[in-house]
Amino acid sequence: VYALDGEVVLPLADLEKIFGVTAVLSEDHTSLRVDASEQALLESGESYYGARDVYWLSHIINAEAGNQPMDGQIAVGNVVLNRVADERFPNSVKEVVFDRRGGVAQFSPTADGRISLTPDEDAELAAKLAFEGYDPVGESLYFINHSACNASWFNSRLTYTATIGDHVFYA
């Protein structure tokens, strides 16, 4: 899985394997025939995460990264999920999103009200992709908008992992 011009792309061979189908490209490369005679039974990813978690994750993604490329939106979701999995942080999506460690909102949209904005379809897709394991930033637990924040504290104390769009990610 990778991103291309802000879109999530999955190689055809992987799709064939996942769905248990065979895809045949026409000789002139203008059409694709899919043989689903041996269709695999896939359980929806939504059976592994709840609507409430998608709700809060898509809201924070929209508020923090709604103007960023899809990889950047997914990466913000990854930071939240990485925190949920890390014993140093709260253990639910909502608790991580609204965490006020040291009396300071860990995600500014919870302090300024942007968390209440309705997420668009991209933010919801990014949340679901993050839940389903697409992860462009590895073990990142923090991110900043480098155009709106001085990175010196982050650079001196944390390990840089990636830059996507306007955000710099750290572990």
Q: Which residues fall in each region the model found?
A:
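Primary recognition of N-terminal secretory signal peptides and signal-anchoring hydrophobic helices
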Residues: 1-58
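Bacterial extracytoplasmic/cell-wall-associated proteins, especially those involved in peptidoglycan
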Residues: 43-171
